[in-house]
Curated annotation (Swiss-Prot):
Keywords: Chloroplast, Plastid, Ribonucleoprotein, Ribosomal protein
Gene this chain is encoded by: ycf65
Name recorded for this polypeptide: Small ribosomal subunit protein cS23
Record carries keyword GTP-binding: no
Intracellular or extracellular location(s): Plastid, Chloroplast
Functional description taken from the UniProt entry: Probably a ribosomal protein or a ribosome-associated protein.
A GO biological process held by the record: translation
Coiled coil region boundaries: none
Family label: Belongs to the chloroplast-specific ribosomal protein cS23 family.
Pfam families per UniProt: PSRP-3_Ycf65 (PF04839)
GO molecular function, one term: structural constituent of ribosome
Source species taxonomy: Eukaryota, Rhodophyta, Bangiophyceae, Cyanidiales, Cyanidiaceae
PANTHER family attached to this UniProt entry: 30S RIBOSOMAL PROTEIN 3, CHLOROPLASTIC (PTHR35108), OS04G0461100 PROTEIN (PTHR35108:SF1)
InterPro entries xref list: PSRP-3/Ycf65_sf, Ribosomal_PSRP3/Ycf65
Annotated organism of origin: Cyanidium caldarium (Red alga)
Signal peptide limits: none
Amino acid sequence: MKQYKIKVLWLRNNIAIAVDRLIGDSLFPMTYYYFWPRTDAWEQLKIELDSQPGLFAKDKVVILNQVTRIIDYWQENKKSVFPNLSELQSHFPDLICSGCY
């Protein structure tokens, strides 16, 4: 996952998830933000990742598995409007939390 970063926006009723590619020290967006459970963010990310040239199938599986774990964690902790960011970081070291609202 060192080549990819998952970004989340932690909201009270939704979680927004996007994937960026890390090239050197710069991040480049690979996907839009998709909202769970407002829409099926996992499926939308899968479709968008499927369309990415040069993305290996094993990397896609790792990314989507990580997204699944993040969604599960959000569902278990969504009552917490502001998550404990250090706890989030310990569960998901490659995660970038874009904000909490």
